[in-house]
Amino acid sequence: EFLREADFEGHPVPPAGAVTTGGLQGTYNGILTFANVDRETVSQLLPNNFQLAPRKTNHLPNLHPVVLMFGDPTDGAFVVSPTATQPTGIHYSEMILAVPFVQKSNQSGGWHTYIVRMYLDNAAAVAGGIPYGYQKVLASVEWKGRYARVWDTLAGDYLEGDFRWGEHWYDGNAALT
């Protein structure tokens, strides 16, 4: 059972709008899975200047959601202008660990989704995240059926297990309208 917007104090931060120059774009094919984790454990994933949004309800009071995204970004391109892109040909697999319903410390209001770590199997994609401040790590990423694994040959497993992917959450095309 996923904790929802109604369970937290605050509100969504409206998107800034489309990137018209200087950004990157691509197609994301992937799976999202949610888990409720002990709030204290989740709060330790955040940097000092961020906090978990205060709870509005007593629904699952000691838990906070985390998101795991397993995906294969394709069709990567630099956004050169509002009407022109430069294809990069990049394709890779990744796993992203994110924490929704996060606020800047000592500030009420807008929620952010904090990206804790991104594991990617492409060195160029890892390097491409540096200017944006992403915590990207080069790793092997595999997800087939219910099984998923993220590992490094020297560091060992970062994550391994069988997941229950569940039902479709919503139509992604509806989010674009």
Which residue stretches match the model-derived regions?
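Extracytosolic secretory-pathway proteins
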Residues: Q25-V37, I90-E94, R164-W165, W169-D171, ...
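Internal, well-folded beta-alpha domain core
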Residues: Q103-T177
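Short N-terminal edge-element motif at the start of the domain
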Residues: S43-Q135
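N-terminal intrinsically disordered, low-complexity segments enriched in P/E/S/T
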Residues: E1-V19, S93-L97, A124-A125, I130, ...
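N-terminal domain-onset segments
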Residues: E1-V79
